[in-house]
A protein has these predicted regions:
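Selective hydrophobic functional segments
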Residues: 43-99, 195-241, 245
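Residues within membrane-spanning alpha-helices of integral membrane proteins
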Residues: 2, 46, 101-105, 109, ...
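Membrane-interface alpha-helices at helix entry/exit sites of multi-pass transporters
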Residues: 37-45, 68-73, 177-188
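Hydrophobic alpha-helical transmembrane segments in multi-pass integral membrane proteins
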Residues: 84, 152-159, 198-206, 213, ...
Length: 267
């Protein structure tokens, strides 16, 4: 049964690096196949997700060429935001946030469906040269706002986390002239900082079922390596559509669970 989580991790890792929704596959599997309670499943999922970022980093060197400084800055902000989220988690139960989470997820899903004006919609051409000067083209006030928003996303990821990767991708694609594949690569690796924070926090405050983290993490690493290669060859518009649809489905399920309202007969 434990080895089952390797293919689960591969599927979740691909979903995570392509759409930012790894938990759509991994979290339910931990609940139903492993029989973990919700909190324990979230802990295992966060710990295993670190390997997804590692696999993505190994696979995305082409996209990240010339963008390592930008990635490092984003990771630092996400890291400190994640610390804030972990601290808030000790003071506020995550259940207090469940009623507005569907709004965040739905907003991210809708925004990802709308291409940014700075983005070139290409079908996988290997054109990853960094664009000179794009970092300094914003005013200092806008830069501060971007830093603050990245920090908030990091805090949200450390506190609750659902679809935080989509929110970061939406922000990155709208605040830089990077191609979609580059922003996606930065998102995939940078979000690992929040998962590192969460894992360190849970190591002291909760019990981590490491026997499940290992096979799931192996799968996440493999899926994280495969995902960027898929993004590299698929047209961006199809990735956007898939991500948007999955995000809206997740938003509905979160809405249904939070408000105990079912708009459809089966779910």
């Amino acid at each position: 049964m434990i080895l089952l989580f390797i293919p689960v991790g591969i599927l979740a890792g691909i979903l995570g690096t392509v759409t930012g929704l790894a938990s759509l596959a991994s979290y339910p599997a931990l609940l139903y196949f492993a029989g973990l309670p919700a909190v324990s499943a979230n802990v295992v999922n966060k710990a295993a997700l670190m390997f997804n970022s590692i696999g993505s980093a190994v696979s995305s060197t082409q996209e990240l060429h010339g963008h390592w400084k930008e990635l490092f800055k984003t990771m630092i902000i996400i890291f400190f935001g994640g610390i804030t989220g972990a601290i808030l988690l000790t003071a506020l139960p995550s259940s207090s946030f469940t009623h507005i989470v569907p709004v965040f997820i739905a907003a991210g899903g809708i925004m990802i469906l709308i291409p940014s004006k700075n983005e070139e919609d290409h079908a996988g051409a290997n054109n990853f040269e960094p664009r000179k000067g794009h970092v300094n083209q914003h005013s200092w006030l806008r830069n501060i706002l971007i830093i603050f928003l990245v920090y908030l996303i990091g805090a949200y990821s450390g506190y609750f986390g659902a679809a935080s990767g989509i929110l970061l991708l939406v922000l990155l694609t709208r605040t830089s002239s990077n191609e979609y594949t580059v922003s996606n690569a930065i998102r995939n690796v940078a979000m690992g900082a929040a998962n590192i924070v969460a894992t360190i926090y849970y190591s002291f405050e909760a019990h981590i079922v490491w026997i499940l983290v290992l096979p799931l993490g192996i799968g996440f690493f493999i899926g994280g390596y495969i995902g960027p290669k898929i993004v590299r060859v698929l047209p961006v518009k199809y990735i956007r559509i898939l991500t948007g649809i999955l995000a809206l489905i997740l938003a509905y399920t979160q809405f249904s669970a939070a408000y105990n309202i079912k708009l459809f007969y089966l779910f």
